[in-house]
Design a protein with these regions (language model features):
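Conserved phosphate-binding/catalytic region of the ribokinase-like
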Residues: 1-3, 26, 147, 196-287
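Short, glycine/acidic-enriched loop or turn micro-motifs at the edges of active sites
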Residues: 9-10, 14, 60, 161, ...
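Short, conserved phosphate/pyrophosphate- and ester-handling motifs at nucleotide-, phospho-/glycolipid
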Residues: 45, 188, 245
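Glycine-rich phosphate/adenosyl-contacting loop at the front of the ribokinase-like
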Residues: 1-55, 62-66, 238
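Ribokinase/PfkB-type carbohydrate-kinase core domain
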Residues: 1-8, 69-81, 93-228
Length: 287
């Protein structure tokens, strides 16, 4: 089973027809979807054949119930605390595809309840860095990581966002990852550049670092600095990049654990990510 810890929130995706006209109207297409990096990974995993579980906190409100229901319908084992107000993120998509995020995470970072029994049948625990930088969720996530490690689970960390890394502090973040010692560390090219990894070495403390570089080849670096580059197949008719990195994780992680083949796992990750790129928001197209 693949388990994730973190945020389950609403994404309000706004496709702008032009640069915003401040003080007046701008024609747009607006769509509401389930979001949150941890929830996305769990859902994409379930929809593509991997048993998955999501652990987090949502509000005790209609939106929280709706979001949980959408995960359950996808086949995810949903384990949440329902208390407070569910968060939302507004994603502004410019005509050139550039995205801007307006973030209100609500109670997503308020999770403090730890139920170690939820790790009993977990083979992979995936934790976005969003879950490691704000209390009490950060301490809760670390306790789950320790519980999973004690049972032999593979630990995966995603860098999540350059803004998250900068706000937390690069040196502090690298020290945190060093202390966790994850088997897999996932990041994109911008995050890798900020962390100073990729050119000669992977993320300190991680057994395997995987750097996704958009349409360019994906780079994998082992702890002993062995490099592997995998070409990314071009994707036609890209609609939206929201959730593509989460889809990659949902494909890469179970395949890597099952096969121990980095190239095969990267190809699987990109195959699922391509389905998200062709669909609006963090959703899969029809395979």
């Amino acid at each position: 089973m693949l388990c994730t810890i973190g945020d389950l929130i609403e994404d309000v995706v706004v496709w702008l027809s032009a640069e915003p006209n401040l003080g007046t109207d701008t024609d747009s297409i607006i769509q509401r979807t389930r979001g949150g990096s941890a929830a996305n990974v769990a859902m994409f995993a379930a929809l593509t054949g991997t048993e998955s579980r999501f652990i987090g906190q949502v509000g005790n409100d209609a939106l929280g119930q709706q979001l949980c229901s959408s995960l359950q319908q996808a086949g995810v084992d949903v384990c949440v605390v329902a208390e407070g107000r569910t968060g939302s993120i507004v994603v502004l998509v410019q005509p050139n595809g550039e995205r801007t995020f307006l973030t209100d995470r609500g109670v997503a970072s308020h999770l403090s309840l730890v139920d170690a029994s939820l790790m009993a049948n977990v083979g992979i625990l995936h934790v976005p860095s969003y879950s490691l930088v704000t209390e009490p969720l950060a301490s809760t996530s670390l306790l789950y990581i320790k519980a999973a490690q004690s049972l032999g689970a593979v630990i995966s960390i995603d860098a999540s966002s350059t803004s998250v890394l900068e706000h937390f502090g690069i040196a502090r973040y690298k020290s945190l990852i060093q202390s966790i010692q994850p088997q897999v560390f996932l990041c994109n090219g911008d995050e890798a550049g900020l962390l100073g990894v990729g050119a000669t070495e992977g993320m300190p403390g991680a057994a395997l670092t995987v750097i996704k570089r958009g349409a360019h080849s994906t780079l994998a670096i082992s702890q002993n600095n062995e490099h592997c580059e995998v070409t990314v197949a071009p994707v036609a008719n890209i609609v939206d990049t929201t959730g593509a990195g989460d889809a990659f994780a949902a494909g890469f992680l179970p395949t890597f654990v099952a096969t121990n083949d980095v190239e095969v796992a990267i190809a699987r990750g990109h195959a699922i990510a391509a389905r998200v790129l062709r669909s609006p928001g963090a959703t899969l197209d029809v395979a």
